[in-house]
A protein has these predicted regions:
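Active-site clefts of carbohydrate-active enzymes
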Residues: 351-384
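Aromatic- and acid-rich polysaccharide-binding/catalytic face
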Residues: 110, 116, 308-342, 400
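Aromatic/acidic polysaccharide-binding cleft in carbohydrate-active enzymes
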Residues: 364, 378-431
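Catalytic domains of carbohydrate-active enzymes, especially glycoside hydrolases
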Residues: 53-87, 91-102, 320-325
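Aromatic, loop-rich ligand-recognition surfaces of beta-strand-rich domains
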Residues: 145-204, 210-265
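Carbohydrate-binding surface patches
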Residues: 453-493, 522
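Glycan-recognition and catalytic regions of carbohydrate-active enzymes
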Residues: 410, 420-469
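C-terminal beta-strand-rich structural cap/linker in extracellular carbohydrate-active enzymes
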Residues: 510-531
Length: 531
């Protein structure tokens, strides 16, 4: 059950009309962009709900108009930012692009955006492992795996004959013995005669057995070094010229592997780098907000890259370098897990807590399948109902802008992949959101409200006060998509009062401070009661 606990007010018959349709109007030139007291965008003094498309070319402008989007974020075309923004302006659309001094002052420039996902995790190692001449690198098997301590992983050496890698350590070590962990796979060459050189001096020549596992070799005398080079001088031939290696190890007098350098996760852009870019942008153009999009790795449920302590340190630092914070998670497109749709809502709640009450928050929402992370024959469809549910989850939890991710990679690449039914559904949804934006972005209602679904199904709601009316935006959050009856308790609501169901052509009759309604799985309803 979700609750607001705030002062009470009285309500009477709801006789007000629905907000007038304004969806089709081209957007006017921007004189001023502000952040309002409800963490909303305000353009020329009026509340504005950005409905964004990500990284589209100018050729996709008709697609954006077809779904009722109002903002293109990221320049996905070949035009320079200045020309790109002009193309958007000519079609009544706003643009958000990477900072570009040449693009400043454009009539439809809504804001600037940092490089995408600065928090995206990458693995680094304290040891630098460098390839020798002629070695072809395989990005899926990075060289640092050779000293990561994981014996079941491997690194491709292509070609294996004469392959050479150099391990550079942060500080000198002294070893008494060395180890080589081979991988043996059908059809692949296997290392046979190998050599080790430390600081340019040979310390070991060895012949390896054609078998898996560690092969250990004592040195004639201890060797001290910070740079160790391993070379394959001959191979057990295979059908392929390439082979692989699992680990190199070096043991000190105590028997510890002092070559061991487990990788760790770090953001691809350090907070200090993002902060410097933010200061540069704000110094050059203080008139426009700076946006950022994060991955979902700030969420409590995701600690596979950053543990809780790292999350708590990293993300507040990032947050200080933006005016608007967003994130992306694609439960079906990225994970094939429709049961994860709730994470869109949870992510917005957690991001809102990080952003604070005054910073706008946005969420990127999936619209289609075709990801490179799920096999094409296994990919589930992203349905219009899924996308609509995710959008409302984000808005109810506090997002004040919505973005749509429309790219696909399979079976072929497209910037804008939604078709047919999804395009029509997005147009209906975005037109509705454009109409409702003043109410959605209004101040929280000064009323005590409770919502409970039958059978204790999960639910949530948002309530605002706009132009003398109480607005309630409510949703069934049950991931099993069960239907439930919602009971709303609204302090001050008079028995017999009519509650308008916005955009549904029907109304409800209140009991004494209460009304009920049916909610299909993941469905939302919008209610209006006159104050």
């Amino acid at each position: 059950m979700s609750k607001f606990l705030v002062p009470t007010a009285s309500f009477v018959l709801a006789g007000l009309s629905v907000l007038s349709a304004i969806a089709a109007a081209p957007l006017p030139p921007i004189q001023q962009v502000e952040i309002g007291k409800n963490a909303e965008f305000r353009v020329n003094g009026q509340p504005f709900l950005p409905l964004m498309l990500w990284l589209q070319s100018e050729a996709r402008i008709p697609d954006g108009l077809a779904i009722g989007a109002n903002t293109f974020t990221g320049n996905g075309g070949k035009l320079g930012n200045r020309e790109y923004l002009k193309a958007l302006a000519d079609n009544g659309l706003y643009g958000i692009v990477d900072f570009d001094p040449e693009a400043g002052g454009q009539s439809h420039l809504l804001g600037w955006i940092h490089g995408d996902e600065p928090d995206l995790a990458k693995q680094v190692s304290d040891a630098e492992v460098l390839p020798g001449a002629g070695l072809r690198l395989n990005s899926s098997t990075p060289l640092f795996r050779i000293v990561d301590g994981v014996a079941h992983s491997w690194t491709v050496l292509d070609p294996l004959q004469d392959a050479e890698v150099t391990v550079k350590l942060a500080k000198p070590v002294t070893v008494k013995s060395l180890g080589v962990w081979l991988t043996v796979s059908a059809g692949l060459a296997v290392a046979k005669d190998v050599s080790f050189t430390a600081e340019g001096q040979g310390i070991l020549n060895a012949t390896l057995k054609n078998e898996k596992g560690e092969q250990h070799f004592d040195l004639e005398k201890p060797a001290t070094f910070s740079s160790l080079t391993f070379r394959v001088r001959s191979t057990y031939p295979g059908e392929q010229v390439w082979g692989s290696l699992s680990e190199l190890s070096g043991y000190d007098e105590a028997g510890d592997n002092v070559l061991l350098s487990p990788p760790r996760w770090v953001p691809r852009s350090a907070p200090e780098e993002v902060s410097a870019e933010y200061r540069k942008i704000k110094q050059a153009d203080p008139t426009r907000p700076v946006l950022v999009t994060f991955t979902a790795h700030f969420m409590k449920e995701f600690t596979d890259k950053y543990d809780q302590a790292t999350q708590e340190k990293l993300y507040p630092e990032f947050m200080n370098s933006c005016d608007v914070a967003g994130y992306d998670i694609y439960p079906i497109f990225g994970w094939n897990k429709p049961e994860w749709l709730y994470r869109v809502a949870d992510g917005v709640s957690e991001l809102r807590a990080l952003a604070g009450p005054k910073r706008p928050v946005h969420a990127w929402i999936e619209t289609n399948k075709g990801s490179q992370w799920v096999a094409p024959d296994r990919q589930l469809d992203v349905t219009p109902k899924d996308t609509r549910a995710e959008v409302w989850m984000a808005l109810i939890r506090g997002a004040t802008a919505i973005g749509y991710f429309t790219h696909r990679w399979k079976p072929d690449y497209k910037q804008f992949a939604p078709e047919g039914e999804m395009v029509a559904a997005l147009k209906r949804l975005n037109d509705q959101l454009t109409r409702l934006a003043p109410a959605l972005l209004a101040a929280p209602a000064a009323t005590r409200i409770e919502m409970k679904l039958s059978d204790d199904l999960p639910c949530h709601f948002k309530a605002t006060s706009h132009e003398g009316a109480l607005w309630i935006f409510a949703q069934n959050m049950d991931m099993q998509k069960r239907t439930g009856t919602a009971t709303f308790r609204v302090d001050g609501l008079k028995a017999g009062a009519k509650i308008e169901e916005v955009d549904e052509g029907r109304s409800l009759t209140a009991g004494d401070a209460v009304f009920t309604d049916q909610f299909e799985g993941l469905a939302e309803h919008v209610y209006r009661l006159a104050e």
